[in-house]
Amino acid sequence: MNIQEIISDKVTQALVAAGAPAGSEALVRPSAKVQFGDYQANGIMSAAKKMGLPPRQLAEQVVANLALDGIASKVEIAGPGFINIFLDAAWLAAQADAALADPRLGVARVEPQTIVVDYSAPNVAKEMHVGHLRSTIIGDAAVRTLEFLGHNVIRANHVGDWGTQFGMLIAYLEKVQGSSETGDMALADLEAFYREAKKHYDEDAAFAERARGYVVKLQGGDEYCREMWRKLVDITMRQNQRNYDRLNVTLTDDDVMGESLYNPMLPGIVADLKAKGLATESEGATVVFLNEFRNKEGEPMGVIVQKKDGGYLYTTTDIACAKYRYETLGANRILYYIDSRQHQHLMQAWTIVRKAGYVPDSVSLEHHMFGMMLGKDGKPFKTRAGGTIKLADLLDEAIERAAKLIAAKNPELSGDELKALVEVVGIGAVKYADLSKNRTTDYIFDWDNMLAFEGNTAPYMQYAYTRVASIFKRAGIDENTLQGAITLTEEREKALATRLMQFEETILSVAREGTPHVMCAYLYEVAGLFSSFYEACPILNAEEESVRASRLKLAALTARTLKTGLDTLGIKTVERM
């Protein structure tokens, strides 16, 4: 049920009937204040200007043609030409009843698209660190949202599994192959392994020569080198999967589409760019000059697609990547959850992709960029010693802090119940603190704020859900067997129902813009409206049975909306806190 869309269609029809030009937009939005109704149509001024009419005159004509009988109880013209629409309480109650009866809460399935979502993208032979957190959890929230709406989503974990460093790693793996630990080494050891390999490469000329030879062999498909390379990849991805599982992220090994996947395509792409006259030789390298981007001298910027020594760059891989996602995966839309510092690089690659005809304009290429995670000092979040914080260590600390918090609040909890609750709250706090911020901005990582039981935090939202669910437990009522109809006679009943019925509008916005903070803000508002309703409107102690039944249904719809919304974010809920 998309009330905004229903009203928008009605206002658009009324605009046409009033003689507005084709394409005039209704611009229907939820009203910011209750005195302006539940929805407001803001498109009158623009249409009136095109028609040469006073806005209020056009607004009067639109209202005269507005077919909202049964949907709106009142329609008013305000200010220079805004149309305020007040929803009919009986109609709204019927929609809320229908939403509660629907496992999807009234959210319609969309016409499915094939959408590729590129996110997480850790590097092989290195442990995941806090810098991977935002891409991983924001991307996964987008995936969950798109799948809920019915899209065919292809997860693409663009793992850094290729490059000259693998010659060095293979050479060192060969050197220590006799060690019984090597085959199953933990990734923490593999980080030390990487440092030792680099040290040998820098200090031992013979080792460096052998490493360079292995790069050539690996790129040539040498079976021995491929086997050693695969071992390094497998060790890394096993550890990464543990992080994904702890984070309640839906990525698996089946979603890995590493850089190595695109290597066979690179020579053909460079040759094709040359044949199309897009790439030229410049100082021994193959370069695409783009008029859309200018260097400091104001000249077209040169983007290297093949180095003088024959090697390829990330841009070449990203060109192949976009081409593959359209031609092989059949993408209608491709979303990249990569930090904002990569924006120009991606724009250059996509400009080449479009010019070469690899991806048509009908396919959307979208950089859903995000800012940095900062410490309280406003600098990139690091250890006290200035080092990179490992993601696993961050999650361990989140659980430790949540354990202390919950032990202080609920000392009677113990055993498996306590362990499960601590993990849900600790991991949820880290994720929600990130997801609740506008992804385009930097944000301050603050343990005290994210674990607080007040404000727009995971603990508050998880508690809000359990608070609603506890109503049914206390009364011994199964929320799936509720009888009667929803009626909305109190102001706070209607305010809660109106916001609950905007769930579809919210989830469509998140899917369109890739902005999970919009869902967080919505759920936080729903929780607040429920608190106001709960305080003002007795539920179990309502004087009339019909009112009690109605309010129980509103509570059930609230609980299901909170749970479903949090699930689209990848945040778990519990029945008791």
Curated annotation (Swiss-Prot):
Any GO BP: arginyl-tRNA aminoacylation
Principal EC category: ligase
Catalytic activity: tRNA(Arg) + L-arginine + ATP = L-arginyl-tRNA(Arg) + AMP + diphosphate
Key words of the record: Aminoacyl-tRNA synthetase, ATP-binding, Cytoplasm, Ligase, Nucleotide-binding, Protein biosynthesis
Keyword Nucleotide-binding set for record: yes
Signal peptide: none
SUPFAM superfamilies linked to this entry: Anticodon-binding domain of a subclass of class I aminoacyl-tRNA synthetases (SSF47323), Arginyl-tRNA synthetase (ArgRS), N-terminal 'additional' domain (SSF55190), Nucleotidylyl transferase (SSF52374)
PROSITE patterns: AA_TRNA_LIGASE_I
Motif ('HIGH' region): 122-132
Annotated SMART domains: Arg_tRNA_synt_N, DALR_1
Name of the protein in question: Arginine--tRNA ligase
Name of the encoding gene: argS
UniProt family annotation: Belongs to the class-I aminoacyl-tRNA synthetase family.
GO molecular function, a single term: ATP binding
Compartments, as annotated in UniProt: Cytoplasm
A GO cellular-component term linked to this record: cytoplasm
Record lineage: Bacteria, Pseudomonadati, Pseudomonadota, Gammaproteobacteria, Enterobacterales
Pfam family, one: DALR_1
Species assigned in the record: Edwardsiella ictaluri (strain 93-146)
Subunit structure: Monomer.
Enzyme nomenclature, EC number: 6.1.1.19
NCBIfam families noted in UniProt: argS
InterPro entries the record matches: aa-tRNA-synth_I_CS (IPR001412), Arg-tRNA-ligase (IPR001278), Arg-tRNA-synth_N (IPR005148), Arg-tRNA-synth_N_sf (IPR036695), ArgRS_core (IPR035684), DALR_anticod-bd (IPR008909), Rossmann-like_a/b/a_fold (IPR014729), tRNAsynth_Ia_anticodon-bd (IPR009080)
